[in-house]
A protein has these predicted regions:
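Solvent-exposed, non-transmembrane regions of membrane-associated and secreted proteins
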Residues: 1-131
Length: 131
């Protein structure tokens, strides 16, 4: 199975981070992580990317519909447009379910953004590939 290594950028929010495969603490201490068993850029399906709310995804709290997200890998550049965002419970993993007819990107971080300790919820951003 191939893995994701690249960069995610959300220019309006001044987010620019390396993306590595996996979401273990060691990976997330250094980079955003591609959530295992989710799609890869360019594939039909749902790509999951997670990062800490107090570091790389700190500015995600200011996301808006239509914000542009770019994922750059060795295979090319993929551009997405934010279509929605919401707060869910950690057990609501259905946000990562495959999207059989679309190329989607789901960003995941802990919520609330200014919470001390283990955050009780997750902030989810959903985007559709535009090119």
């Amino acid at each position: 199975m191939r893995s994701l290594a690249g960069r995610i950028e959300i220019p309006r929010l001044r987010i620019s981070a390396i993306v590595k495969e996996g979401v273990d603490e060691r990976t997330l201490d250094l980079a955003a992580g591609h959530i295992p068993n989710t799609a890869l850029p360019g594939q039909t399906g749902n790509i999951g990317v997670a990062a800490h709310r107090d570091t790389l995804f700190r500015n995600l709290k200011d996301v808006r519909r239509d914000d542009q997200i770019t994922l750059t890998t060795l295979d090319g550049e993929y551009v997405y447009r934010v279509v929605s965002f919401k707060v869910v419970k950690p057990a609501e993993v259905s946000v990562l379910d495959p999207s059989p007819d679309e190329k989607t990107l789901t960003l995941v971080t802990c919520y609330p953004f200014y919470f001390v300790g283990n955050a009780p919820k997750r902030f989810i951003v959903r985007a559709l590939q535009v090119f």
